[in-house]
Amino acid sequence: MPNDPLLQPYQLKHLTLRNRIIVTAHEPAYPEDGMPKERYRAYTVERARGGVAMTMTAGSAAVSKDSPPVFNNLLAYRDEIVPWIREMTDAVHEEGAVIMIQLTHLGRRTRWDKGDWLPVVAPSHHREAAHRAFPKKIEDWDIDRIIKDFADAAERMKAGGMDGVELEAYGHLIDQFASPLTNELDGPYGGSLDNRMRFCFDVLKAIRARVGDEFILGVRYTADECLPGGTDKAEGLEISKRLKESGLIDYLNIIRGHIDTDPGLTDVIPIQGMANSPHLDFAGEIRAATNFPTFHAAKIPDVATARHAIASGKVDMVGMTRAHMTDPHIVRKIIEKREEDIRPCVGANYCLDRIYQGGAAYCIHNAATGRELTMPHSIAKAHCRRKVVVVGTGPAGLEAARVAGERGHEVIVFEAASDPGGQVRLTAQSPRRREMISIIDWRMSQCEKLGVTFHFNTWAEAEAIQAESPDVVIIATGGLPHTEVLSRGNELVVSAWDIISGDAKPGTNVLIFDDAGDHAALQAAEFLATAGARVEIMTPDRSFAPEVMAMNLVPYMRCLQKLDVTFTVTYRLEAVEKSGNELVAHVGSDYGGISKQRTFDQVVVNHGTIPLDELYFELKPFSSNLGEIAHDQMIAGEPQSVVRNAEGKFQLFRIGDAVAARNTHAAIYDALRLLKDI
């Protein structure tokens, strides 16, 4: 048996799990027509191939038609899901992993205007703030129907080859019954804890009657809502004991907190700048009190924390879910004693925030995740060695250098600054975003292992690039802040970058005009307000900081509201002029009919970046493709074959913000899909 606690097998009823690491249930929003088709299967199988003991799919699969798929959920109520499930389970089993699926009825945690436009049901009329739907108070015939739906869905999953099912209780219908905050029913399903737990046990009994004993059944539930009047720790312990004593389930999966609001969700699933494993000790208390198999996941991003979770006996199986979105091969690298090669999860939460905004989940710095059908997690060697010159060491340039190095090419990188990182190094200046620098550090480490040559403090000139006789040139020079957005007074403003970097001294009465909606404006506001300034953030948008997204916004708002920062939406800064020692801001609105003046001593503009593209255009006439990228080939993940200049000596590509202001993920994706076939 291995000495590493993480690599020790675990016996869960009739199943032997090959190690202690699991990918807990989550919904990456990859279903097509409610089915786990090729894309979803490829994503799931990659984690099994990487060595996890168990992967749980769906977060969660809907059991009823009145549980609309607001997260693009799998539709477990449809019979046609069975063959798709069978293809997935067979493929996962071939890789040696166990696979389960999570089932749910969302209750009020959805919307009536999704799916079949059926009323949302819950044990009270109280809406969930996050999804805003006012529910119908559930009736007796609804309860009977939904219990049967759970059993039918579990039977389908067993027919599809699943090793078990997990009930998603927390925040969903089962926990809405269990919590005194959300259950206002009379009769057998409301009031006392016995009655509030009745729905959960009726569902479990119905499922167990259908699937038999040789099938794993677990519950992921809230053992402490951390809300006045809600399920508290004492009641959570009692619920845990009752679940064990029922004899109906095989493990507990512990959650602490509530997810009905963005702040609540962010405390349950912490992001960067928040503490690692904040609920691990609590899960350990549940395990100690019940002496029953216990699973847990909540910001356990690294092997050391996971190892502690198992070695200390706090849990039996440790979930590293977001970590496996970043690197699906964590277990393989542990076994091969290559922990330093594990791509680190930086807690940026790009994955979850995209889901909650209605998109598919992507990792901020692994562009292959969710694109396994076209993008590789392991880079294959090229058939012939080429010389690749990269200009810039932001995320795009470093990813290009890393991938080219993995291909076996000679790689030379030029960087004008003394340190790598570009905008990522800048954003990591803020304590809450310090983890972002790992995006850069990991790539630098990988590049050094691959023999990439770096020239820092070197301004790359076109002649110097051509003197290298490259086969491929990658321009990843990024951009500079775009502040030329006013009708007059552009010379009087500073950029958000100036504030974050410390290049501009903070004012005392500051307007931040945020026309980009990304992190920079909020970071600048936090820096200024912490320094004692009175700060107002103004945006012409009707919503605030849309590019930051919901969960990432929470820590900012908690800080900025306490510092009395003012937030103004739907107003546009049009011009700035100097008046003595003050600045007069001329403010209008896209909605028209507004013109007013405000006085500040500093104005900050956040309006994205302008590409640093002079070098690209200097080199373009000498390239074989004249800088052109074949979009169809790029989208399909195929090699670039454009030749527009037969006399050209090299292929030329520009990527990241050297093309246009986008984000870190887009920059890394540019690099991966262009360089993987070079």
Swiss-Prot record:
Pfam families: Oxidored_FMN, Pyr_redox_2. Its EC number is 1.3.1.-. Binds 1 [4Fe-4S] cluster per monomer via a modified motif. Induction: By stachydrine. One of its GO terms (molecular function) is 2,4-dienoyl-CoA reductase (NADPH) activity. GO terms for biological process: fatty acid beta-oxidation, unsaturated, even number, reductase/isomerase pathway; L-proline betaine catabolic process. SUPFAM superfamilies: FAD/NAD(P)-binding domain (SSF51905), FMN-linked oxidoreductases (SSF51395). Disruption phenotype: Loss of growth on stachydrine and its degradation product N-methylproline; still grows on proline. Proline uptake is reduced by 41%. Stachydrine (an osmoprotectant) no longer protects cells against growth inhibition by 500 mM NaCl. Stachydrine uptake is normal, but its metabolism to ethanol-insoluble compounds after 18 hours is seriously impaired. Colonizes Moapa 69 M.sativa plants as well as wild-type but is slightly impaired in competition with wild-type bacteria. [4Fe-4S] cluster binds at residues 345, 351, 363. It catalyses: N-methyl-L-proline + NAD(+) + H2O = L-proline + formaldehyde + NADH + H(+). Pathway: Amine and polyamine degradation; stachydrine degradation. It comes from the Bacteria. Its cofactor is FMN; FAD; [4Fe-4S] cluster. Gene3D superfamilies: Aldolase class I, FAD/NAD(P)-binding domain, NAD(P)-binding Rossmann-like Domain. Keywords: FAD, Flavoprotein, FMN, Iron, Iron-sulfur, Metal-binding, NAD, Oxidoreductase, Plasmid. InterPro entries: Aldolase_TIM (IPR013785), FAD/NAD-bd_sf (IPR036188), FAD/NAD-binding_dom (IPR023753), NADH:flavin_oxidoreductase (IPR051793), OxRdtase_FMN_N (IPR001155). FAD binds at residues 396, 415, 423, 433, 460. FMN binds at residues 59, 102, 220, 299, 321-322. Possible NADH-dependent oxidase, may function as a demethylase that converts N-methylproline to proline. PANTHER family: 2,4-DIENOYL-COA REDUCTASE, 2,4-DIENOYL-COA REDUCTASE [(2E)-ENOYL-COA-PRODUCING]. In the N-terminal section; belongs to the NADH:flavin oxidoreductase/NADH oxidase family. This is Probable N-methylproline demethylase. It comes from Rhizobium meliloti (strain 1021).
